[in-house]
């Protein structure tokens, strides 16, 4: 990073602050020493103008609709790569050679099984428990079963924990689904690829032969790639903040899952699907467009707009193509939800109201339709998001551990409570 400087003036005080520039992207004013030198700190609710760290993993240009992983466009990775190749890239910084990929795939496969006692752990949950509640508990409990990989100061243990998390998340997610619907658990089959293995664990039953459809497996793999990492979002920041205290990796990922469960974060694809269902038919779209424009109407178009993107989410285009491939393979030619989605997207992209407000389709707009077609209930949508995002969380966590500038996270607040006052005994109040 090359350094320039900026002046901050308030009252009679003026300080020079270093300005840093990354490889690409906007310049950043470094205020790390501001409080130490001036007893003043900044106010930024939601951290919308704050960089909490340096990172070489993911770059987003929201104005241009660009998403890069280690410099590679998401479009190229989703079109030509597979999920484990992207995992290797996020973890190690480069795409693997053929030999490296073979070795990495083998090491992940080696860890797909979970401790047999985990199956009994599941029975402590109600059958109607939300799968995300189950995932929070089970992932957090992994440190009790795999305590030989919780020393964060040991690079080897961190590597083992990383592989275990990537390998075991599909198994745990499938177990959560099977437990939820009352079917027996299906063990992983390690001669299958990552996505095929997951689909088999979800949808196979002991009494029937299950053959994974390669088109559906490829779609599942692409969905995993599209959700693998997305810079310093709420759940990733949660993982980093938890990790800054020295917490073990399983606890940090469980914290990320809990944050992702929030409807404003991981639940957006479910909300988008519910919205399409509510609209019902194409001829009702104008009614809902009008409602979306009405400030006094609580209705909001879900799957449009993004906290970062002020252009078309690059993942949305890939997700739209994937949705068509899945529906075509399954022979679903007249899906009313897809018809509504296509027409709604067309109107939104040509309507001045949405263009001016930069409300473009995001990745959640088509992912709900695709996951529904694959056979997943809406309660599993966020679980699949967590499964895919685990590698991003792990890569970000590892980067934080290795960063010499990182310390325990400690945001400040602007105190607006009562000033100093004296305690009054209860008998005199």
UniProtKB/Swiss-Prot annotation:
InterPro entries: Citrate_synth-like_lrg_a-sub (IPR016142), Citrate_synth-like_sm_a-sub (IPR016143), Citrate_synthase (IPR002020), Citrate_synthase_AS (IPR019810), Citrate_synthase_bac-typ (IPR024176), Citrate_synthase_sf (IPR036969), Citrate_synthase_typ-I (IPR010953). One of its GO terms (molecular function) is citrate (Si)-synthase activity. The active site is at 306, 364. GO terms for biological process: tricarboxylic acid cycle. Pathway: Carbohydrate metabolism; tricarboxylic acid cycle; isocitrate from oxaloacetate: step 1/2. It catalyses: oxaloacetate + acetyl-CoA + H2O = citrate + CoA + H(+). Belongs to the citrate synthase family. This is Citrate synthase, chromosomal.
């Amino acid at each position: 990073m090359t350094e320039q400087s900026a002046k901050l003036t308030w009252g009679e005080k003026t300080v020079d602050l270093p300005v840093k520039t990354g490889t690409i992207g906007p310049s950043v004013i470094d205020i790390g020493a501001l409080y130490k030198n001036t007893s003043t700190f900044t106010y930024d609710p939601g951290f919308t103008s704050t960089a909490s760290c340096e990172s070489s993993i993911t770059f987003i240009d929201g104005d241009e609709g660009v998403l890069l992983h280690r410099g590679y466009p998401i479009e190229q990775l989703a079109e030509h790569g597979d999920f484990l190749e992207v995992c290797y890239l996020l973890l190690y910084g480069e795409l693997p050679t053929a030999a490296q990929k073979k070795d990495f795939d083998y090491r992940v496969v080696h860890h797909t099984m979970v401790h047999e006692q985990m199956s009994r752990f599941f029975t402590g949950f109600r059958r109607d428990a939300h799968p995300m509640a189950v995932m929070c508990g089970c992932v957090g409990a992994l440190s009790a079963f795999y305590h030989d990989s919780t020393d964060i100061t040991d690079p080897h243990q961190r590597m083992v924990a990383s592989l275990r998390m990537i390998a075991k998340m599909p198994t745990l997610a499938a177990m959560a689904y099977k437990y939820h619907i009352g079917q027996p658990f299906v063990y992983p089959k390690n001669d299958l690829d990552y996505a095929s293995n997951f689909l088999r664990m979800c949808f196979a039953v002991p009494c029937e032969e299950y053959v994974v459809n390669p088109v559906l497996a490829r779609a599942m793999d692409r969905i995993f790639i599209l959700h693998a990492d997305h810079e310093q979002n709420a759940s990733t920041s949660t993982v980093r903040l938890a990790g800054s205290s020295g917490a073990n990796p399983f606890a940090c990922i469980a914290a990320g899952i809990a944050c992702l469960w929030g409807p404003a974060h991981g639940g957006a694809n479910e909300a988008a699907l519910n919205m399409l269902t509510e609209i019902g038919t194409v001829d009702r779209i104008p009614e809902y467009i009008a409602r979306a424009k009405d400030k006094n109407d609580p209705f909001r178009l879900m799957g449009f707009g993004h906290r970062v993107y002020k252009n078309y989410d690059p993942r949305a285009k890939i997700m739209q193509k994937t949705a068509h491939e899945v529906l075509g393979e399954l022979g679903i030619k007249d899906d009313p939800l897809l018809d509504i989605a296509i027409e709604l997207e067309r109107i939104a992209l040509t309507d001045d109201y949405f263009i001016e407000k930069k409300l473009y389709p995001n990745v959640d707009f088509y992912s709900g339709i695709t996951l529904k077609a694959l056979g997943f209930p809406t309660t599993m949508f966020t679980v699949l998001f967590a499964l895919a995002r685990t590698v991003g969380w792990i890569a970000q966590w590892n980067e934080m551990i290795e960063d010499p500038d990182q310390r325990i996270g400690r945001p400040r607040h602007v105190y607006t409570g009562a000033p100093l006052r004296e305690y009054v005994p209860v008998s005199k109040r």
